[in-house]
A protein has these predicted regions:
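Feature primarily recognizes SF3-like P-loop helicase cores of small DNA viruses
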Residues: 1-167
């Protein structure tokens, strides 16, 4: 996860070099009070050429093609409120916990039994995505992104808290 967070004393690109030829990159946990490196996020998710190098190796350039999936309990702080950054962000809330009687201890076997149907749904979803893109996001995702953006905008929060309309 640290490869996508701001570092104030490190400008090396070996983290980027590991993204070469990757399609999906997963990262877990950001920690509290961390900030996105918005420029790096835009660079690696924009489909542009990225210049990087492995440790003690020469630089090389590659076309980034990743989809970044970050699983975290604490969303990193954001300083960039441009459309270029926020169009890349999708917050998918996983609010349900399965404990006690809600926990299905046979879930793996059930999923194995449905594996051909699951694969068919994945293929159908992929075809829909390649034809139409992600235009119809679920309400919960749209709301979570809006909440994240609003919580990140300290200037807007200050104005809402301290400025009153007297007109």
């Amino acid at each position: 996860f640290d490869a996508f967070l701001k570092k104030y004393n490190n400008t090396s690109s070996h983290d980027l070099a590991r993204l070469h030829n990757a399609r999906v990159v997963t990262a877990n946990e950001s920690g509290i009070s961390k900030h996105w490196d918005e420029e790096r996020i835009k660079e690696i998710t924009g489909g542009d050429n990225v210049t990087a190098r492995h440790l003690y190796k020469s630089e090389f350039t590659f076309k980034s093609q990743i989809k970044l999936w970050c699983a975290t309990n604490n969303l990193p702080k954001v300083d960039d409120f441009t459309h270029a950054f926020w169009r890349r962000i999708k917050v998918i809330p996983f609010n349900r916990r399965f404990e006690g009687d809600d926990r299905d201890t046979n879930m793996i076997d059930k999923l194995k039994g449905e594996s051909s149907g699951i694969l068919n749904r994945i293929i159908k979803g992929f075809k829909e995505w390649t034809e139409a893109g992600l235009t119809n996001l679920p309400y919960q995702v749209k709301q979570a992104v809006e909440d994240y953006r609003n919580e990140s905008d300290v200037i807007a929060q200050f104005i809402a808290d301290r400025i009153t309309d007297v007109g």
